[in-house]
Design a protein with these regions (language model features):
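Residues lining hydrophobic/aromatic ligand-binding pockets adjacent to catalytic sites
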Residues: 1-151
Length: 151
């Protein structure tokens, strides 16, 4: 495995979100929210899983990789290992709710745990390329270790 994508669902309509996934040829989505719920009903876990499956994209929720609760280190490590396992077979994106991976401050900082917590752990497991999909579909890459983070 050399590449993993990240995305935040934000306020997208499902059709727009699906278009972003298809644009990047995503085959599997790993939900890295602590709880697979959203005020946007299309992003509630069971609904999202069904919508993705109907469009040929796999889905798995790994709450132990969420940023809202502090998981046991061994649970978090197991979750990250599971992401790498899935990504070794399928083009994979990890998803949380935050649409922008970086803040808009003068000195950008991690805006979500995909950048501040998960990306460094994925890189430590040999993932060489992490591509963050922006709300407009543009891919960006950066060295997450240089970005200030609260995670």
């Amino acid at each position: 495995v050399s590449t993993i994508y990240t995305i935040g669902h934000g306020r997208h309509a499902f059709a727009d979100f699906l278009e972003l996934l298809q644009q990047h040829e995503i085959e599997f989505l790993v939900d890295v929210r602590s709880v697979a719920r959203s005020r946007w009903p299309q992003f509630n876990g069971l609904v999202l899983a069904e919508l993705l499956r109907d469009n040929g994209i796999g889905y798995e929720h790994l709450p132990e990789t969420g940023g809202k609760t502090k998981p046991k280190p061994e649970d978090l490590a197991h979750g990250v290992d599971r992401i790498v396992e899935i990504a070794s077979e399928l083009r994979t994106v990890i998803m949380c709710s935050e649409s922008q991976p970086l803040s808009q401050h003068k000195v950008p900082r991690a805006n979500c745990h995909r950048v501040g917590m998960l990306a460094p752990m994925l890189r430590a497991r040999g993932i060489g390329q992490i591509i963050h999909i922006l709300p407009n579909g543009a891919p960006i890459e950066f060295d997450e270790s240089t970005v200030p983070s609260i995670w």
